[in-house]
Amino acid sequence: QKTTRLIKEKFTKVEIQTTFQSRFGPQEWLTPYTDKTLESLPKKGIKNLLVICPGFASDCVETLEEINIQGKESFLKSGGVNFDLIPCLNDNSDHIELFEKLVNRYI
């Protein structure tokens, strides 16, 4: 939620929302759910979507399959027009340098 707040401070002219991914089983999970939100946005007039997953350092099944394939399909089938996913940091040199600095603190 802090990440969302900081991003909102930088990008004041666009709507930014946090949703929660990876619920499993029948137990209640943090809300709003990503999948339900992606379905509902086109009905609220939001047809273009840019998604970022700052909770993930590297792309994985959740970002590649659940968000970029299943989520995109759900958004578009519900009336969305454009869906783009910003890749995670993955093997970006800045990301690797950050890990190096963090590890070097402890060795």
Which residues fall in each region the model found?
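Extended amphipathic ligand-handling, pore-lining, and cofactor/metal-binding catalytic surfaces
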Residues: 1-107
